[in-house]
């Protein structure tokens, strides 16, 4: 049982543990039921930015520990891959997008120029890039609110954020390995 704050450190937590003890001592019969679940088939579509939107791809200057962790996990599962991660911003403006983009860039709100820089997607043949977006992105909404309210950037209409996973697979059947990687759900939470 994992709870925060730790119940064993408070008097109120005693009730939880005494209840657990009582449950264990009464030997309640466990009614096992089989669970059958078949996840829905994943559909991947080619990304098309919205009309009048600009795309920023942000790379880290330093090593991305999350990408290294994902790469190590995939390699432990037997996949010979290299993994990198980038942040994807889709910025929709009402007019004069170059001036609006300059304001957004100057704000430092979407990326920290001391640690990150604007980049491009990799273009190697063995690399595939996958854009993953959250269904409800609170972080992106906070950035949008900050840009429109705090920095008074009125021409910003919409902001979308995602993570781009770049997976390089060398010397193998790319499609079958890629589908096996997707089946691990390590890149996203379905």
Residue ranges and their predicted role:
Residues 1-49:
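Amide-donor transfer/coupling interface in amidating biosynthetic enzymes
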Residues 34-190:
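Core nucleic-acid recognition elements
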């Amino acid at each position: 049982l994992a709870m925060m704050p730790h119940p064993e450190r408070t008097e109120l937590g005693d009730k939880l543990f005494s209840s657990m003890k009582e449950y264990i001592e009464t030997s309640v019969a466990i009614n096992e039921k089989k669970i059958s679940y078949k996840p829905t088939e994943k559909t991947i579509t080619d990304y098309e930015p919205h009309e009048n939107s600009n795309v920023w791809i942000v790379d880290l200057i330093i090593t991305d520990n999350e990408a290294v962790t994902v790469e190590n996990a995939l390699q432990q599962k037997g996949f010979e891959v290299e993994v990198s991660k980038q942040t994807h911003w889709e910025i929709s403006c009402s007019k004069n997008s170059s001036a609006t983009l300059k304001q957004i860039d100057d704000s430092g709100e979407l990326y920290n120029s001391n640690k990150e820089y604007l980049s491009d997607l990799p273009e190697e043949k063995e690399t595939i890039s996958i854009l993953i977006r959250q269904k409800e992105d609170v972080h992106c909404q906070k950035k949008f609110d900050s840009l429109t309210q705090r920095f008074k950037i009125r021409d910003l209409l919409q902001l979308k954020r995602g993570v781009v996973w770049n997976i390089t697979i060398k010397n193998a059947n790319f499609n079958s390995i890629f589908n096996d990687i997707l089946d691990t759900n390590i890149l996203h939470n379905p």
